[in-house]
Regions:
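Metal-dependent polysaccharide deacetylase catalytic core of the NodB/CE4 family, i.e.
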Residues: 3-6, 53-55, 75-189, 220-221
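Short, glycine/acidic-enriched loop or turn micro-motifs at the edges of active sites
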Residues: 63-64, 147
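C-terminal active-site subregion of NodB/CE4 polysaccharide deacetylases
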Residues: 1-58, 64-65, 69, 136, ...
C-alpha cells in the first residue's frame, strides 16, 4: 500500500521516486505478476490459479505525485496498479483547465493544508491525469469515498453519500463499473459495510496488515504498508511470497 511517491525522504506515508522505481524493477526482474483487482478477487474466490509469484500494487488518496513520479516507473516496468481516489478532491482539481504538473510537490502536511484551502489542483489528480493513466492499460481507479471521512461513526445518510456518490461519479467519468472500495483510515462498522455491499461493492480494501490467500474475505482485503527502502521491500517479498514463512512472520509480528 502506497500513498505519496515524491522526493520528500522521511516524510509521512512517502516513498521516494528512486526507491519506488527500485521496488518496481525488483518485481519485474524477479518475475512477479502484478494483478489487476478483478484478478485478485477471482483468485480469492478460487476462480484463478496462479503458477507464478504475484503481487497487487495499490495507492490511496489519488495524489498528483502518483502521476508525476509513480506512473513513469509503472510504465517502464509494465506494472499494473490500482489507485483509490477521493472524488471530491478529483472534482475540485478538475475545475482548473491546466494540467498542473509541477517540478516539485508539497510535503504530506502541506498537501493536507492545501486540501483544506480547497486548492486540490496543486496536490490531487484530475480527470485528465486519470484518463491518461487509465488509457495506458496499467492503472485502474476505484473508490476511496467522496470526501475521505471515517466511516465508522457517520449516520446512514452520510454513509450513503460518501460510499454511493463516489461510486456513481467514478462510473460516469470512467464509463465502467466501480465494484471496489477502500475505507479511509481503515475505519468502518457493520452499518458502513452493509451499505457498501448494498450499493454494489464486491470487494473492499482495509488497512489491516497481512497477505491475501484463496478464501480470504473479499470484504476485508488486507494490505502491507510499503517502506522507503528497496532492501526492506525485497526481504519482505521473500517472506510474504512463502505461505509458511508468511504465516509465521505475521504471527510473530502480531504477538510482539
Amino acid at each position: 500500500m502506497y500513498h505519496h511517491i515524491n522526493p520528500h525522504k522521511g516524510d509521512m506515508v512517502t516513498v521516494t521516486p528512486e526507491v519506488f522505481e527500485g521496488q518496481m524493477a525488483y518485481l519485474h526482474n524477479a518475475g512477479y505478476r502484478t494483478l489487476r483487482i478483478d484478478e485478485l478477487v477471482s483468485y480469492i474466490k478460487g476462480e484463478l490459479s496462479l503458477n507464478q509469484k504475484a503481487a497487487v500494487i495499490t495507492f490511496d488518496d489519488g495524489w498528483l505525485d502518483n502521476y508525476i513520479y509513480a506512473f513513469p516507473a509503472l510504465k517502464k516496468y509494465s506494472i499494473n496498479a490500482a489507485i483509490f481516489i477521493i472524488t471530491d478532491r478529483i472534482e475540485r482539481a478538475s475545475l482548473h483547465n491546466e494540467r498542473n504538473n509541477p517540478s516539485s510537490v508539497p510535503t504530506h502536511k502541506e498537501s493536507k493544508l492545501l486540501i483544506e484551502k480547497k486548492e486540490d489542483y496543486r496536490v490531487a489528480l484530475n480527470w485528465g491525469h486519470i484518463k491518461e493513466m487509465s488509457d495506458s492499460g496499467l492503472v485502474e481507479f476505484y473508490s476511496h469515498t467522496k470526501s475521505h471521512m471515517k466511516c465508522n461513526d457517520l449516520p446512514e445518510d452520510e454513509l450513503l453519500e460518501e460510499i454511493g456518490k463516489s461510486k456513481k461519479i467514478i462510473e460516469e467519468k470512467m464509463g465502467r463499473p466501480c465494484p471496489y472500495l477502500c475505507w479511509p483510515y481503515g475505519k468502518y462498522n457493520d452499518t458502513a459495510l452493509r451499505i457498501a455491499v448494498n450499493t454494489g461493492y464486491e470487494a473492499i480494501f482495509i488497512t489491516g496488515h497481512g497477505v491475501v490467500e484463496k478464501g480470504s474475505d473479499p470484504l476485508a482485503i488486507k494490505r502491507i504498508v510499503v517502506k522507503d527502502s528497496v532492501a526492506w521491500f525485497k526481504n519482505k517479498m521473500v517472506i510474504y511470497i512463502n505461505p509458511v514463512l508468511s504465516r509465521l512472520y505475521l504471527m510473530f509480528r502480531k504477538k510482539f
